[in-house]
Curated annotation (Swiss-Prot):
It comes from the Bacteria. It comes from Helicobacter pylori (strain HPAG1). The gene is fusA. Its main location: cytoplasm. It is found in: Cytoplasm. This is Elongation factor G. NCBIfam families: EF-G (TIGR00484), PRK12740.1-3 (NF009379), PRK12740.1-5 (NF009381), small_GTP (TIGR00231). One of its GO terms (molecular function) is translation elongation factor activity. Signal peptide: none annotated. Residues 8-283 form the tr-type G domain. Disulfide bonds: none annotated.
Amino acid sequence: MARKTPLNRIRNIGIAAHIDAGKTTTSERILFYTGVSHKIGEVHDGAATMDWMEQEKERGITITSAATTCFWKDHQINLIDTPGHVDFTIEVERSMRVLDGAVSVFCSVGGVQPQSETVWRQANKYGVPRIVFVNKMDRIGANFYNVENQIKLRLKANPVPINIPIGAEDTFIGVIDLVQMKAIVWNNETMGSKYDVEEIPSDLLEKAKQYREKLVEAVAEQDEALMEKYLGGEELSVEEIKKGIKTGCLNMSLVPMLCGSSFKNKGVQTLLDAVIDYLPAPTEVVDIKGIDPKTEEEVFVKSSDDGEFAGLAFKIMTDPFVGQLTFVRVYRGKLESGSYVYNSTKDKKERVGRLLKMHSNKREDIKEVYAGEICAFVGLKDTLTGDTLCDEKNAVVLERMEFPEPVIHIAVEPKTKADQEKMGVALGKLAEEDPSFRVMTQEETGQTLIGGMGELHLEIIVDRLKREFKVEAEIGQPQVAFRETIRSSVSKEHKYAKQSGGRGQYGHVFIKLEPKEPGSGYEFVNEISGGVIPKEYIPAVDKGIQEAMQNGVLAGYPVVDFKVTLYDGSYHDVDSSEMAFKIAGSMAFKEASRAANPVLLEPMMKVEVEVPEEYMGDVIGDLNRRRGQINSMDDRLGLKIVNAFVPLVEMFGYSTDLRSATQGRGTYSMEFDHYGEVPSNIAKEIVEKRKG
């Protein structure tokens, strides 16, 4: 079976947005106009095809990125729906990794919101070119030009409108295409499937000319030949303008900006045209970096059908009918179902039972998959998110994704004995699917703890336990993931010697402990010279310290951000062993930490609260009581926006308190930002409570 769509006609795109910008509705409309779904699923009545997990239908938010294939004007679009809630940023990171381009959806009323900033940062991190779609132009308070300014100010980007709205709110009927300089007006009777191309209304001609001028200037900057033509007063052709927009979009010096109303079926076809005109094909993005596992040298994987198979597993899902689905982005070569692949991250071979092309919740079996495609593999047992699958003879490890540590833990108890075993299996499966979710057993109490990125994240996990795995579980009070660190440098010596009968134990080390920058982690430096400690014992010292740092001296929390230098010591020909040096390292670290001015750290959340002005005073007072530090206060559409850092431990139950303080009119969002030092009086309480 040969490839159906040439590689240069494939677009792997994601639709990324803030919770209520209308992302799922936009994805739905894309599927409708490209002829995939016959009845449009509305999020308002809980029936969108992309949102296929039960909880998403209830909450009306998108949690798992479903990958869907559709076709538009001889191009194949693989659409990855990304979640917009902060607790699910890991999903967004993951989809960004395998996308070639993105459509950022903004609400014409709400504009740039905190989550939009996070998603924008992630797209910058992975170098994903994007176009902006300003949605909900039919809503009261819709303002396209406002959003344009916010993108400049808040996202520090360069938005260049390629169409502008005709009317707004109730009078929004279409757009002016600035490339063709024509008006496009949608027909309400045909669900927006048909539209008329007309002359630009006279009252908008001036504005259209002004924005066309801005567009042409931005395009001319992309190319010297175009710049000369532009400065010489010559008109640029439609083809030249399109080419310039694409160049700028791909090098990320400009962001093409369009508008519409997905819910009212206006502007979706123009968005699809922009996707195929301006977003990159797999052949137009930078070659993906990888490492040759044998030589550890950097190699580049070029997207093409020639060459050996290479792909990245970016998502794992459990499907009730087929078992485990591993979503893979294929970067190079092709693969047939039933063949073997090599997992270079784990150094294991796996057999691919079936290849499935997903359409949000329907599936189609395919015989083989080619470069540039996104496909679900069935039958892989050991492959996890972020693993590379490739050909064994031409192995490569594509760069790994980085996953954040959980900031909140909750104890879960199965309701019955029968649930006990099922719960262990279920939590294991969920942890495979979601690397930002962790499961552990608390040593002192033997309780099972689950950790994640926020309360909503864990609520959904517990909900999935009940629905998908039929496990009833009780949950405890949320617990915050505190950390410890040191504030001063200390040198310590520890000699571990046991010589009473039989073979003795002897390990002797001198270490220097120093604080490091927040977030920089642990570093071990070996400065032993002249063989005072034999080479084979040095890793044991490092290991001893790494084990000891899991339980800090203050309250038993993990110790972070410090450097240990092993600079001297001694050994015994007969009695020294790895074990002895491990113990010596661990004891030296504990003694040094006690003397190094240890402090407690807590997760600080970046909180943004949006409230009507009359509640502003109460909300700020409340945030101050929660030990928050207010960073800024802004206005957005008649509401006050408060930005603050607040300790996570003070934020439990905040949504209920905010609702009652603002009569349900306040909203907030929060995401983990950094670890901050706990004030000494509060640290004292925490330590006493831990030591019971």
